[in-house]
Amino acid sequence: MSRSLSSNGRVRRRKRILKLAKGFRGRCGTNYKAAKDAVSKALAHSYVARRDRKGSMRRLWISRINASVRTQGLSYSRFMNGLLQAGIALNRKVLSNMAIEDPGAFQTVIDASKKALGGGAC
């Protein structure tokens, strides 16, 4: 029975880690042991950041909608309540995009929300 060696797998594994560590500062980009730790930490941070980004995008959409709606004399919460009562099912991403790119259509949505609230008084 022939003796199995791990050199091929080991080379591939080291190359993969060092490729992921390309651009890291100092020893972390060239030394396998340091690169392994740095890559592990970087991947963990990116995993968390992908989840955090979802919340920050939602906060951004809400800020944009709030800014657009306040110019029409409504608060964000009253506007969203009006949409719910009017049966308009648009998510915050679409509403935010509409407020920026198509103010005319967004104005129609605001008017529908005000009508559902009954007059639109703040």
UniProtKB/Swiss-Prot annotation:
Keywords assigned by UniProt, alphabetized: Ribonucleoprotein, Ribosomal protein, RNA-binding, rRNA-binding
InterPro entries: Ribosomal_bL20, RIBOSOMAL_L20_CS, Ribosomal_protein_bL20_C
Pfam families referenced in this protein's UniProt entry, alphabetically: Ribosomal_L20
S-S bonds: none
PROSITE patterns assigned to the protein according to its UniProt record, in alphabetical order: RIBOSOMAL_L20
GO molecular function: rRNA binding; structural constituent of ribosome
GO term, biological process aspect, one: ribosomal large subunit assembly
Claim: Transmembrane is one of the keywords in the record: no
GO cellular component terms attached to this protein's record: ribonucleoprotein complex; ribosome
Domain of life of the native organism: Bacteria
Role description: Binds directly to 23S ribosomal RNA and is necessary for the in vitro assembly process of the 50S ribosomal subunit. It is not involved in the protein synthesizing functions of that subunit.
Matches recorded under HAMAP family: Ribosomal_bL20
UniProt record similarity statement: Belongs to the bacterial ribosomal protein bL20 family.
Protein name from the UniProt record: Large ribosomal subunit protein bL20
Source organism per UniProt: Treponema pallidum (strain Nichols)
Gene behind this protein: rplT
